[in-house]
Amino acid sequence: MKIRRATSEDLQQLYAFNHRMYPERLNYKEIIDFWIAKSPEAINDIIVVADDDGKIKGQQLFSSMSYYRDGVEVDGTWAFDLIVDEELRAGSQGFSLMWKCKKEHPHTMSSGSNDISMAINMKIGNKHIGDLKKFVGIANPLWLLTSVFRGSVPSNKFPQVLKTKGAIYQKIEHLENIPQIKESYNLQLLEYSRKLDFITWRFFSGLHDYALYKRDLSDDYFVVRTIVRNHVTSLVLVDYRCRLSDESNMDKIICAFKSLASKLKLGVLIVGSSVALVDSVCMRYHFKAVGRDRPILGMISCEDSDRVRETRNFILLTLADTDGEVTW
């Protein structure tokens, strides 16, 4: 067995391995293509376990993503989909894969590890620096019935303008109107970059049908799409950027988000939050935290990870930064 970086010659094997390991992902090819389309070198970020015949037996997927800390940009990666073949799980291949990944990608973060994986990650140097909570709210009880058996709502059915609480948001239809965010939005937080190349790849590459709304006279924005689970259509706040030093900025985004759901006659709303201020705004609008908090792990220096995790004022993470929303 060899643990190495993937190449373009491994693509068909990656398809086959992911189809076998994640049978519930009917669009597994599209998901892999989405990640490796980010850059010409993207497939080389992936670490695989391969036998002597080149058949893939394990993987850890990575996506290059830069982040800001204290206003300084750091090149890093996002890690996800760590899995090895059943026949290797009794041995040391899983740990060896994780150790190889640490050496190849020293500035990486991830979320959602189970208890066993998290314990191993902590032993090899990861810090538990936060948790991503999923909040669920109701836009209007009257729209719950109209959300059943409705299917996805295409973004071309979304309104062009949202007016709410002293703010106006315009839906962005053309790439030249995408916000030009070239630096950290919130200096007090570790925050992933939202440069033009990220926004273009993440929301305009066609994997899912997103709508991006930008606030007038500002680069504040939020991104939404609909998902269908158990025949119920929900509206998801996938991404957002605003100055979190002023709670009213996030309040305007949540208010506009709820207004959009009402215009679309959708009852269920979903928001991801890793920051106490966002938690507070969501709860003020009667959102409830549901499910298991997804631990955020990082190969970074952090003097008191217990404190920053408890205060939830260290890292800004949205559903767009994680791999989970991509598979919804």
Where are these regions (language model features)?
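Amide-forming acyltransferase catalytic core, primarily the GNAT-like/NAT-type
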Residues: 6, 12-52, 66-67, 122-238
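Active-site/acyl-donor-binding loops of N-acyltransferases
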Residues: 64, 108-161, 223-247, 255-328
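Conserved acetyl-CoA-binding loop-helix of GNAT-fold acetyltransferases
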Residues: 81-104, 247-259
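Extreme N-terminal starter segment of soluble prokaryotic enzymes
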Residues: 1-3
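Beta-sheet entry/capping signal
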Residues: 46-47, 59, 76, 106-109, ...
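Conserved acetyl-CoA binding element of GNAT-fold acetyltransferases
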Residues: 73-86, 232-244
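Conserved GNAT-family N-acetyltransferase fold
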Residues: 48, 58-60, 77, 82, ...
